[in-house]
């Protein structure tokens, strides 16, 4: 299988990313692997082919993830014809580019749709990823598995919503890594105007009714083709616990990961989501769950696989690559 990982910028990739582990798994199964950054693609004026200035990946005996990634960056750039790929794995985070490089933000789904039309297997499905990259995507799932919410740019509407439902969380509709996420106790919150203003600087806000138990963190569960990702009987899921008084459990803002036992409640949530995720082509996603409610769907470059590896001493990435092999009809 000729596989390329489409990332934000090859130069900023690091060994701890889930993408690094996915690339390692693909190489260890005998596949050809390339890294392509958002600014590395060209459309040939004569033949109309999509061409990329790509970095070849090679995992050798004795490599650590750090040395593996270092050598990817050090290798000479090679030109590859992306039309000839078997699969393209979209691992860029368009939300990260919205502020500093807005021109780069949509390129994953744009190039992905072009290549899909040319016969390349693209995951996650770029046509659906346009919606799924937004927190609005959660609103397409059954009401019973999501908190009450409001999407708006009206500060007064936010205040009215909080006055109706009480304790709430407000965050940017397009955002991640815990940036500009605030807890609002009630509509009389002293800093409500400042918090709302900070969130609305990033565009639309989404306000969610606070889910009881959220102060203790959330569960990050990885789903592959609508089912819990697992390897050798171990499930790819963990609990993210916030530190101190910070409600955000994101690892990127200091949250810590602890083992999680998947119970009937979590399985019921997944069952309610599975059919739609599969229909939408959401091959590999992470969901954040509190109690019986999903508070976020991470459909674009979902991270945290390293926590699964550390907690359970298992590499689940080969299971992801095996599923991709089945999709492309490739053999290891």
Tell me what each language-model feature is.
Residues 92-95, 173-175, 302:
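Short glycine-rich anion-binding loops that position phosphate/pyrophosphate groups of nucleotides
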Residues 6-7, 260-332:
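ATP-dependent carboxylate activation and anion-phosphoryl transfer catalytic cores
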């Amino acid at each position: 299988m000729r596989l390329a990982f489409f990332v934000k910028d090859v130069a900023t990739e690091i060994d701890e990313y889930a993408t690094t582990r996915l690339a390692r798994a693909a190489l260890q199964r005998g596949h050809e692997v390339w890294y392509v950054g958002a600014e590395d693609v060209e459309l040939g004026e004569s033949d109309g082919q999509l061409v990329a200035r790509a970095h070849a990946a090679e995992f050798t005996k004795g490599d650590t993830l750090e040395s593996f990634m270092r050598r990817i960056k050090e290798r000479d750039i090679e030109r590859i014809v992306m039309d000839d790929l078997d699969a393209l794995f979209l691992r860029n985070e368009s939300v990260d580019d919205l502020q500093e490089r807005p021109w780069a933000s949509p390129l994953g789904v744009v190039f992905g749709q072009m290549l899909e039309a040319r016969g390349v297997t693209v995951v996650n499905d770029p046509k659906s990823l346009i919606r799924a990259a937004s927190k609005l995507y959660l609103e397409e799932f059954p009401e019973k598995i999501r908190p009450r919410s409001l999407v708006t740019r009206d500060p007064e509407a936010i205040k009215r919503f909080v006055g109706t439902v009480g304790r709430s969380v407000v965050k940017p509709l397009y955002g991640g890594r815990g940036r500009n996420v605030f807890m609002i106790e009630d509509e009389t919150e002293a800093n409500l105007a400042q918090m709302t203003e900070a969130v609305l600087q990033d565009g639309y806000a989404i306000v969610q009714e606070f889910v009881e138990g959220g102060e203790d963190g959330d569960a990050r569960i990885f789903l592959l083709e609508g089912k819990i990702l697992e390897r050798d009987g171990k499930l790819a899921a963990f609990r993210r616990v916030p530190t101190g008084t910070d409600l955000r459990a994101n690892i990127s803002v200091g949250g810590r990961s602890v083992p999680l036992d998947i119970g009937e409640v979590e399985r019921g949530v997944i069952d309610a989501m599975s059919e739609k995720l599969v229909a939408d082509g959401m091959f590999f996603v992470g969901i954040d769950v509190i109690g019986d409610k999903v508070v976020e769907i991470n459909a674009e470059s979902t991270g945290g696989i390293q926590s699964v590896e550390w907690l359970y001493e298992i590499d689940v990435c080969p299971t992801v690559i095996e599923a991709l092999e089945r999709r492309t009809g490739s053999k290891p």
